[in-house]
Amino acid sequence: MASSSSATSGDDRPPAAGGGTPAQAHAEWAASMHAYYAAAASAAGHPYAAWPLPPQAQQHGLVAAGAGAAYGAGAVPHVPPPPAGTRHAHASMAAGVPYMAGESASAAGKGKRVGKTQRVPSGEINSSSGSGDAGSQGSSEKGDAGANQKGSSSSAKRRKSGAAKTEGEPSQAATVQNAVTEPPLEDKERSASKLLVLAPGRAALTSAAPNLNIGMDPLSASPSSLVQGEVNAAASSQSNASLSQMDERELKRERRKQSNRESARRSRLRKQQECEELAQKVSELTAANGTLRSELDQLKKDCKTMETENKKLMGKILSHDDKMQQSEGPSVVTTLSIQVEAPEPHQGGHGKAS
């Protein structure tokens, strides 16, 4: 029973760093510091061993003598501390060792947004642990198990209260670490909003104005925004109407051009056909003219031959008349004259009968 109570009390209270130091309120933080110094005791001399610990570490029960004892007492000379802001907030940052108490590390970042809580004095924790130990010693084996359960629950509650105190009052070193490593919450939200606005793949509309009332109640929108939306809608409708009118005009112009081209092509084909017909008629007429000319030439030749024959006949007739007049009397001449003059109407078609 005594061993179980001592075990529970040992889990609740961290061991003292040096002789005569008070009990520590933050058990996890002190345990991580002791684990770090115990792990680094066998290594070479740490370059930051001679620096004095921050006042927060001295308040939590870790003195400079206890920290330097892991590397050998008096082995490293005193070195002046570096300027503010350059020292490491925790030993895990200097040597690259992961921080053992994850709750306190996350609580240091939350301390900026959560209000400060009142620190519970260490006397109350000691008194509560003492009362739990006394109750566990005075009970039986069955009661001892219940006391162990109560002690474990009380230790869990104390761990939670320690984490809450760590969240409420972060140390100065943790504040410096969070200020250096993590940007403020407002900067994160601002950068996130910028990233959302500047994300690739979101095309910007040129005609429509951006809507700034996304996720807001439409009933609570201001009348100016509603009027602006109506104006934008009217402008977009006007632009669409103008575009449609321009499209219709373009279509009409294209149709007119197409009809003009078709009419010009038809007229060109018609004129070409007429020209071909006229050329054919000209060729036919020239051929007919040639035949007529040839016939005319033939007629002229026939006329000339007939004229020559007529002249020969007339010469023969005249010579015959002269001979008849010389051989016969006047009666004969008269008869001959009558005979000669009688066929004149028959020979009048030639126009040269005497």
Swiss-Prot record:
Q: Which BP terms from GO are recorded? A: abscisic acid-activated signaling pathway; regulation of DNA-templated transcription
Where do the segments described as Disordered lie?
Answer: 1-24, 106-193, 230-273
This entry's Gene Ontology molecular function terms read: DNA-binding transcription factor activity; sequence-specific DNA binding
The ranges of region (Basic motif) come to 252-271
Which GO terms of the cellular component aspect does the record hold?
nucleus
Q: Where is the composition biased (Basic and acidic residues)?
A: 246-265
Question: Where do the record's region annotations for Leucine-zipper lie?
Answer: 278-299
Start and end residues of each bZIP domain: 250-313
Per the database entry, which stretches of residues form a coiled coil?
A: none
Biased composition range(s): Low complexity: 127-140, 232-245
Keyword annotations of the record: Abscisic acid signaling pathway, DNA-binding, Nucleus, Transcription, Transcription regulation
Subcellular location as annotated = Nucleus
Purpose of the protein: Interacts specifically with the 8-bp sequence 5'-CACGTGGC-3'in the abscisic acid response element (ABARE). Also binds to the hexamer motif 5'-ACGTCA-3' of histone gene promoters.
Oligomer and partners: Heterodimer.
Hey, which family's this protein in? Answer: Belongs to the bZIP family.
- This chain's protein is named DNA-binding protein EMBP-1
Q: Which organism is it from?
A: Triticum aestivum (Wheat)
